[in-house]
Amino acid sequence: MAKEKYDRSKPHVNIGTIGHVDHGKTTLTAAITTVLARRLPTSVNQPKDYASIDAAPEERERGITINTAHVEYETEKRHYAHIDAPGHADYVKNMITGAAQMDGAILVVASTDGPMPQTREHILLSRQVGVKHLIVFMNKVDLVDDEELLELVEMEIRDLLSEYDFPGDDLPVIQGSALKALEGDEKYEDIIMELMSTVDEYIPEPERDTDKPLLLPVEDVFSITGRGTVASGRIDRGTVRVNDEVEIVGIKEDIQKAVVTGVEMFRKQLDEGLAGDNVGVLLRGVQRDEIERGQVLAKPGSINPHTRFKGEVYILSKEEGGRHTPFFNNYRPQFYFRTTDVTGSIELPAGTEMVMPGDNVTIEVELIHPIAVEQGTTFSIREGGRTVGSGIVSEIEA
């Protein structure tokens, strides 16, 4: 069969497998690639075996070492990038650093065990970092003879998901066996195809970066005599056009409004700048000293300056170049947001005495001056210019 060209017109979606250790996340990932390669042979659909996925290369994301396997495959409708983090610690780091932005995930639960401690932790983390759509794959059903037991496990999983504000009663639960599908058992291969069509239907297509409201972290500011003030940086999301009204947010309590009178890239005038572009934006009615690095240009009303938030953080281990000693309540490091460091104090959860290097923990942060943040904003925790932790904003408090 002739291999067709990679079709860019298919929507692209990022997903991953999550769940307790040894419940079959990697086996399921292998089964999906293998069954799709058999049933829908294309140049993209290549079978990956367990060993090649499990031997995930080490990556460094914001100074943190993470093992993650990236595989790709496609269904009739979509192209998928799928991440599988082999170890529990890798999964936690992946979620918190934003190394793996997932639009949705497949929660793998072994029917022989039911939900386990990491099942719970992964569901909580998904909720905290904004993975809104989960599908459940109950694995290893071939090892359970008792139909009632499977029903009990399914109820238990649904209750657990509801506890963390997922639609536990309504979200899809598919029962199958990744290993049997991998071995070529047709009944279980059909279930993998059913799982993939469920993923196609249930996980919505992500909003493209260019469709989101403008956010441009300011890296540099200069003035052009006779023309005004230019703020430059890389557009994080959205678009910016001449005559757009924008807001300058962060560092100061007040939000300042401005009008865009020019957009330049590589010294050329543009009609518009798009997400990913490095641009200079000429602003009318803004003095050189009224805007600075660390602020953002944003679509009016889309983001506000805040000083207090809850965050989910991972603290680097000594081996990763992090701290050698624990820290305690009221620890005051710098928080690096996009382009700038801001000092802040950390309040630990009740009952947590200290945080050791290599731990992950929920913290409350109070910054000394406001920064444009929202749920899902990532940050680094630094001490004297070196990264000692990585986090993501889970809730805005003030």
UniProtKB/Swiss-Prot annotation:
It holds the Pfam family GTP_EFTU. It comes from the Bacteria. Gene3D superfamilies: P-loop containing nucleotide triphosphate hydrolases (3.40.50.300), Translation factors (2.40.30.10). One of its GO terms (cellular component) is cytosol. Residues 84-87 are annotated as: G3. Residues 139-142 are annotated as: G4. Its main location: cytoplasm. Keywords: Cytoplasm, Elongation factor, GTP-binding, Hydrolase, Magnesium, Metal-binding, Nucleotide-binding, Protein biosynthesis. It is an enzyme of class 3 (hydrolase). It is found in: Cytoplasm. Disulfide bonds: none annotated. Residues 19-26 are annotated as: G1. Coiled coil: none annotated. Its EC number is 3.6.5.3. Monomer. GTP hydrolase that promotes the GTP-dependent binding of aminoacyl-tRNA to the A-site of ribosomes during protein biosynthesis. Belongs to the TRAFAC class translation factor GTPase superfamily. Classic translation factor GTPase family. EF-Tu/EF-1A subfamily. This is Elongation factor Tu. The gene is tuf.
